[in-house]
UniProtKB/Swiss-Prot annotation:
EC supergroup of this enzyme: ligase
Molecular function terms, GO-annotated: ATP binding; phosphoribosylamine-glycine ligase activity; phosphoribosylformylglycinamidine cyclo-ligase activity
Stated family: Belongs to the AIR synthase family.
Alphabetical UniProt keywords: ATP-binding, Cytoplasm, Ligase, Nucleotide-binding, Purine biosynthesis
Cell location: Cytoplasm
GO cellular component: cytosol
Pfam family, one: AIRS
Source organism: Caldanaerobacter subterraneus subsp. tengcongensis (strain DSM 15242 / JCM 11007 / NBRC 100824 / MB4) (Thermoanaerobacter tengcongensis)
Listed name of the protein: Phosphoribosylformylglycinamidine cyclo-ligase
Gene: purM
Keyword ATP-binding: yes
Superkingdom field: Bacteria
Amino acid sequence: MKYKDAGVNIDEGNKFVKMIKPFAEKTIKEGVLEGIGGFAALYEIKNYKNPVLVSSTDGVGTKLKIAFMMDKHDTVGIDLVAMCVNDVIVVGAKPLFFLDYFATGKLESEKAIQVIKGVAEGCEIAGCALIGGETAELPGFYKEGEYDLAGFCVGIVEKEEIIDTSSMAIGDVVIGLSSSGLHSNGYSLVRKVFFEKNNFSIEDYVPDIGKTLGEVLLTPTKIYVKSVEVLKGLKIKGMAHITGGGFIENIPRILRKGVSARIYKGSWEVPIIFDMIRRLGEIEEKEMYRTFNMGIGMVVIIDKEEVEKALKRLKEVGETAFVIGEIVEGEGGVIL
């Protein structure tokens, strides 16, 4: 008996690694000493006086189920990178490199290549190098045709440039950067609302959006690296990546003691998909703001004197941003 008889095809795995190398090589930048193929990847840090490494790990969650339903796998890799790098940049760091973990019951190279191609594309957008990963073939562990993804990002920041949330003051302004849609959170509820409660099909056309439901739900998570980069040098008091937990759980993570964030509903246009979910699922408004990003994927808290400068810089790089609130006296929560 051979390992292949138990469901693990080493030859297919080796072939897959060779096939994805060109995608990873496109992301290589200065600092990478050794990437995909070895036991470990090597990255050299240069030109920093007092560097601090910043790390984050995440997955794509049950958004993958939408990819399986559509048999479309070229964007979930972008989601994976976005979920990690967007967490790294909120402390003022720059993403350096990325590693992925791809696990499946039976490796189907053509499908898996599409996933990793998306990871590489996400890394290019974020300006970080895809330097390694793990492909795990686990017979009997996953449903046929399904897989799981996890990612790991390391960034870097000068110690004195770490965003200091303790300087947050009453009167500071909350700027919201628009999301591309649902991003990668709340999909267990989304699937229940559309496919179980209301019997929608992934192919149903949504006239108000001009796309099929599947296309809307699979829209890649926005990567905010370039947008946040242009804010460097301004008096940023804190940043929050609006992921699982929405506004209500994520913004308080960066608030100093004695303040709250007052959010002005109606100060930005909430995408249609969120209203559809609320209406069809009969979901209370507070639950929506505790589950979804509601059209705002990144929150920036900034000194009120620098708001116009920040909005101008963001507009110049094509970012859609809104003044959505302010910092007020409080007990660390979000006031809607």
